[in-house]
Design a protein with these regions (language model features):
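Internal gly/pro-rich beta-alpha loop/helix module
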Residues: 1-38, 43-44, 55-60, 225-231
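Residue-level detector of anion-binding/catalytic polar loops
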Residues: 11, 39, 86, 212-213
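A short acidic, often aromatic-flanked loop/helix-cap motif at beta-alpha or helix-coil junctions
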Residues: 18-24, 48-50, 95, 126, ...
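Phosphate/diphosphate-binding glycine-rich loops and adjacent basic-rich segments that engage nucleotide
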Residues: 25-79, 83, 245, 249-278
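Active-site diphosphate/adenylate-binding microenvironment
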Residues: 56-127
Length: 278
């Protein structure tokens, strides 16, 4: 870290272990940042802080009216994904839960081929752009982007860029729980109009952006009734919004992948090179 800060010409201080010294260091760093009008770093070595008292998690700032959980939505979508299809999933709990479902299915012998998914861990808002690139490069392969409402808001320009390309082989699935669930449960900036169905904001955005086929579902029955898979005669990209609820109990048990991100990338590249689209 220190060599990187030095290379970037960023001033830094190392925080001492005593409380008074730590406070003084932060005051010095703040004063220097104001004086130079530049960022200043304060480095705290591992183990410098004592353990904090455990506090109860904050209550989520979202309603729980939707009957569909994220897992139920992912299970339903995966049932429609073909073996030669490619899936790009957004960061946070969505990718972790998708990974867990795939591992469970593979253990039972019913999972998809290894490398058929790319988990965008730590890359909030970039899943759609990656899916767009794959769909353009391999037009005969169906590509699924499993996105989140907070992630889509992060890089909303990709919505218009994707819609404008009119790719019939791209299915953009948005899981909308109205919050940034993976990072604390804060409500997203998307407005909610009590006079309209929950979730219509993003569906209207997709229509305005130019998606040819726009659908929404708030429960499993609605999702099952939708015929949103395009055929060779259809033109334009598909947008599907699924309203989900937050399930804190599920989040506590979500596994973290054993593989590295490089391993996921290599597996995805191998899949895309060798697995023929049908």
């Amino acid at each position: 870290m220190i060599p990187m800060l030095e290379s970037c010409e960023i001033d830094f201080f190392e925080m001492p272990s005593d409380t008074l010294g730590a406070v003084g260091t932060i005051e010095k760093a703040t004063a220097l940042a104001r004086e130079k009008k530049k960022p200043v770093a304060v480095l705290a070595r591992h183990g410098i802080f004592t353990s904090a008292k455990e506090v109860p998690p904050p209550e989520l700032e979202v309603n729980q009216s939707s009957p569909m959980t994220r897992r139920a939505a992912l299970e339903a979508i995966l049932d429609l994904v073909g073996d030669s299809d490619f899936v790009v999933s957004t960061t946070g709990y969505t990718s972790r839960e998708l990974y867990a479902i795939q591992q469970e299915r593979r253990e039972k012998g019913s999972g998809r081929p290894v490398g058929g998914e790319l988990y965008m861990v730590g890359s909030m808002g970039h899943a759609l752009s990656i899916a767009q690139g794959v769909a353009l490069a391999q037009p005969e392969r169906r590509v699924w982007c499993i996105d989140g409402d907070g992630a889509l808001l992060m890089h909303m320009g990709s919505l218009a860029a994707t819609a404008g390309l009119g790719m019939r082989n791209l299915v953009h699935v948005l899981l909308n729980n109205s919050c940034h669930e993976s990072v604390g449960g804060q409500r997203t900036a998307a407005p909610e109009d009590p006079k309209t169905p929950k979730g219509s904001y993003f569906s209207q955005l997709a229509l305005t952006a130019g998606y040819s086929h726009v659908y929404s579902a708030g429960n499993h029955d609605e999702l099952q009734k939708l015929n949103f898979i395009t055929t060779e005669n259809d033109q334009g990209s598909t947008f599907l919004e699924i309203t989900t609820r937050v399930d804190p109990a599920t989040n506590k048990n979500l596994p973290r992948p054993n593989e590295t991100m490089t391993q996921f990338k290599d597996a995805a590249c191998t899949f895309l090179r060798s697995f023929t689209a049908q």
